[in-house]
Amino acid sequence: MTTPIAKSTRRIVAVVPAAGIGSRMQMDKPKQYLHIHGKTILEHTLSVLLGYPLIEKIILAVAANDPYISTCPLLTHPKIQLVEGGSSRADSVLNGLNAVKSAVQNSEDFWVMVHDAARPCLTHQDLDKLVQVEDQNGAILAIPATDTIKRALHNQQIHYTEDRSQLWLAQTPQFFPIATLAQALEQALAQGLQVTDEASAMEFAGFRPHLVAGRSDNIKVTRPEDFALAEFYLSRTK
């Protein structure tokens, strides 16, 4: 499955799933609405994507009863479109993909970057590397594992040590042809498969996405300690 796609014919959109509640942050609001340097994490994330010239449109998937999204000043940007999120990340992403497919005549020309709402430290340099991938397998940003990784037993004792030389930590954006990813997600959901990211759906469908080495500061704000780190990384770009 290595059909080349000419980069000159591709059109790129972004889908940002932002319907989660972020319970691990132990805050009174979803993590994407926490403020860093006067802007929400979501605003930082959207600003990076809006500033990348190859992205034509950003589909933002939010919860139907989201009480915070109306305060986002970027909602009036002509490139941003809201869609209702689903009960899972995969459902939210699929809703975003379907919104694109229903709005264009030929979705075969479109590729999508799916990016976490709570990953605000993305750089355009990493996006430049990601868009170099040309075949239907697509690609994801990722970093090689550097820590020693242990496989655990059910009682949290060590079972054995993994060979980290072949292990990578997945990041986002994850970059795929829209039609191919939509089909892969639909198949995975229909089969009840655990889809933790878009690449896993593509893997279930028989594709082998490329790993593009990203930056270690492209962190996802998931736990309270991540907040201070993101605050530091974002302070360098002010």
UniProtKB/Swiss-Prot annotation:
The record marks 24, 31 as: Transition state stabilizer. Its EC number is 2.7.7.60. Gene3D superfamilies: Spore Coat Polysaccharide Biosynthesis Protein SpsA, Chain A. It holds the Pfam family IspD. Keywords: Isoprene biosynthesis, Nucleotidyltransferase, Transferase. SUPFAM superfamilies: Nucleotide-diphospho-sugar transferases (SSF53448). Catalyzes the formation of 4-diphosphocytidyl-2-C-methyl-D-erythritol from CTP and 2-C-methyl-D-erythritol 4-phosphate (MEP). NCBIfam families: ispD. PANTHER family: 2-C-METHYL-D-ERYTHRITOL 4-PHOSPHATE CYTIDYLYLTRANSFERASE, CHLOROPLASTIC. This is 2-C-methyl-D-erythritol 4-phosphate cytidylyltransferase. The gene is ispD.
